[in-house]
């Protein structure tokens, strides 16, 4: 059985995972209105003194697993997806700067003209100086999702929680779009998510967080102000913890 919801507290350093599909507004490419709203919410949180790192997917440009089904080599299609994440990172950086928020993009694949290489200690120094650090190009290796990247980066930079922003309100007993009787968990363990096969993120990400006692908060990005609510510890979405 899942545990009852406990009192939640605010966080000081967070890793925000954003799905690339949402950056496209459900289409291929970038939706400036969506990116603007995300940047505004992140800026509000940073101004309150919270340190924010971000991992963005690339699903609005390429999805490696889907390209593989159409005949492309899986490793090569994954690299294409990594490049898509970098485009999203640069877009978010630009909109954050328009909000007056200093930011840095760090990529797992070296591309010195547009971003810094991924260096964990440098990322932590940026965070301590109030800069948003945006991680691009996934893990830099095929077969690893950006959800797994978010879990790994959160652990390496010493984040207190992974804030997993989705297009749904939290973790449900079943897909709420297909099953009208599905109910949302207020709190659940990593193991329960994995054992029940709940399709929130890939099992590797949840397993990594479970092994290292990293909590995950799943919430709806499309609700205005939810990033700030999640950071402050309000009872929104689903808290996944051991």
UniProtKB/Swiss-Prot annotation:
Gene3D superfamilies: Acetylglutamate kinase-like. Its EC number is 2.7.4.22. The gene is pyrH. GO terms for biological process: 'de novo' CTP biosynthetic process; UDP biosynthetic process. Pfam families: AA_kinase. Belongs to the UMP kinase family. Catalyzes the reversible phosphorylation of UMP to UDP. It comes from the Bacteria. One of its GO terms (molecular function) is UMP kinase activity. This is Uridylate kinase. It is found in: Cytoplasm. It catalyses: UMP + ATP = UDP + ADP. Keywords: ATP-binding, Cytoplasm, Kinase, Nucleotide-binding, Pyrimidine biosynthesis, Transferase. ATP binds at residues 17-20, 59, 63, 172, 175. Signal peptide: none annotated. Inhibited by UTP. Homohexamer. One of its GO terms (cellular component) is cytoplasm. It is an enzyme of class 2 (transferase). UMP binds at residues 58, 78, 139-146. Pathway: Pyrimidine metabolism; CTP biosynthesis via de novo pathway; UDP from UMP (UMPK route): step 1/1.
């Amino acid at each position: 059985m899942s545990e009852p919801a406990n009192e939640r507290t605010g966080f000081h350093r967070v890793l925000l995972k954003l799905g690339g599909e949402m950056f496209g507004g459900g289409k291929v490419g970038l939706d400036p209105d969506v990116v603007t709203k995300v940047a505004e919410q992140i800026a509000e949180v940073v101004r309150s003194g919270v340190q924010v790192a971000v991992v963005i997917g690339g699903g609005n440009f390429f999805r490696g697993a889907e390209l593989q089904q159409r005949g492309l080599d899986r490793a090569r299609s994954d690299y294409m997806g990594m490049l898509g994440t970098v485009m999203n990172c640069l877009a978010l950086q630009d909109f954050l700067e328009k909000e007056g928020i200093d930011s840095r993009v760090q990529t797992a694949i070296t591309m010195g003209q547009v971003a810094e290489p991924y260096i964990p200690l440098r990322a932590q120094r940026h965070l301590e100086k109030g800069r948003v650090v945006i991680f691009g190009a996934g893990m830099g290796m095929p077969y690893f999702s950006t959800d797994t990247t978010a879990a790994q980066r959160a652990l390496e930079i010493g984040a207190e929680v992974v804030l997993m922003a989705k297009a749904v309100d939290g973790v449900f007993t079943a897909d709420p779009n297909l099953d009208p009787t599905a109910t949302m968990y207020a709190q659940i363990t990593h193991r329960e998510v994995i054992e029940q096969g709940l399709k929130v993120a890939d099992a590797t990400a949840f397993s990594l967080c479970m092994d290292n006692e990293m909590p995950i908060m799943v919430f709806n990005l499309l609700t205005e102000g939810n990033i700030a609510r999640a950071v402050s510890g309000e009872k929104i979405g689903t808290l996944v913890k051991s």
